[in-house]
Amino acid sequence: MEMDEDPDNLPAQGQGNIIITKYEQGHRAGAAVDLGHEQVDVRKYTNNLGIVHEMELPRVSALEVKQRRKESKRTNKWQKMLADWTKYRSTKKLSQRVCKVIPLAVRGRALSLLLDIDKIKSQNPGKYKVMKEKGKRSSRIIHCIQLDVSHTLQKHMMFIQRFGVKQQELCDILVAYSAYNPVSIPGQRYSWYLCPYSQAWVSLGGVATS
């Protein structure tokens, strides 16, 4: 069966198999859905949050420069705190800094420590892989997730490529979580997924392994 066939016109199990296969094969350079993005230097159109705009961005303003310097200082403070996590993990200072929003540059590491991901992963070896394979057998869930993934942060650098690496990871996370928590409804937007997949999986309430 050709992989370009419309999954909506196939039996349920066939739909699920084709969708999963497309994600496993990954992004195809020059695909119609994102050809426009590959023909330009997207760096000129991308802001500091990774969002790709329709028009080339103007030069950075004095206010933005000031904000970035402030963010850099906050990042340095977080790096020092993360380097001595045992000392700061239960302090008021940590709570205050979390409330001010964790800087993007250290957010992944901070979430990993806050959620105690390494401990949870070691206590549940293989759980994520088992749930992912189980979830792949549900065509209904896969089809719902596929619709959501294709609309998640379409203009963000991480998701701009159809069936790209980050779309693959997001699909895997949601497939696994749908198997782990069957009462969840995979019909919401998942724009929060901007951290490593194992952190996203644990933060959803599941358990992961690398």
UniProtKB/Swiss-Prot annotation:
Domain Rab-GAP TBC as annotated: residue spans: 101-210
Q: Which InterPro entries match?
A: Rab-GAP-TBC_dom, Rab-GAP_TBC_sf, Rab_GAP_TBC_domain
Q: Which domain of life is it from?
A: Eukaryota
Query: What organism is recorded for this protein?
Result: Homo sapiens (Human)
Protein name, entry field = TBC1 domain family member 28
Under Pfam families, the record lists: RabGAP-TBC
